Amino acid sequence: MRTVTTRAELEQSLAQLPRPVALVPTMGALHAGHAALIAAARRTAATVVVSIFVNPRQFANAADVARYPRTLASDQQLAEAAGADLLFTPDVDQIYPPSEPIANVEPGPLATRLEGASRPGHFTGVATVVSRLFDLVRPNEAYFGAKDAQQVRVIEWMAAQRSDQISIHRVTTVRDSDGLALSSRNQMLSASGRVAAAKTIPVALSLIAEAYASGVTSVAMLRTLAERVITAEPSVTLDYLDFAEGATLVPLSESAQVGDAAPGEVLVSLAAVVDGVRLIDAITLP
């Protein structure tokens, strides 16, 4: 695996590597979930490119950008072991050159609710940086984690507006032994915060899945089951627990029955704050 830091090095390296090319965009602090993305890309592409870039445009302030974990040495080891051919680790000026003003990219209609409402401008930043990486890497396909359910749908919408027909793939969420979805943000949790997150967020979603499988379809009843778990832990602050049509993110009413709400899957999304760290997770109900 080769590591490059500039656009010129990236272009030179890509010219020497075979196509099709798969891109795995990340912000670093890589873990087994990222390894699963890289492994999935490896199965289909001749060349796998992993990018590491902490994108300032998707954060609310500079302090949040500075706080984000950076572990380049271990990231290089994980990316190579998982099957990456090329690691692109640009600085801000390589992605957003001062001499080339980069306009924001429209994130589309799926970006207005949930994370879009709680974090204004976040998905504009996400759509902009992913579009920029698509421009630089020119991949045939790109891989994203299903945990970030709204994000991957926003990226699918954005990619569909482009002329280069990049295929977007969702990869199943990887969870730790305690059920918590793997996330680079988990590194920012205290030991007690980690325990609190693990005994609420995945447990609440599992209760929903189990109740639905046993025949409970009322959105109101499923919500009550999950919220009871989360509100019992005072160190966990729930932002939202949302039931929506999986394809459109149109929310289901409290009186709706999950099985009758709409054709296709129902997306259950959850966001909570623990130790000042925002954690998100999601499951789908068939």
Question: What name fits each language-model region?
Answer:
Residues 225-286:
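Phosphate/ribose-recognition catalytic cores of enzymes acting on nucleotide-derived substrates
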Residues 2-235, 244, 276, 283:
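Nucleotidyltransferase catalytic core that binds NTPs
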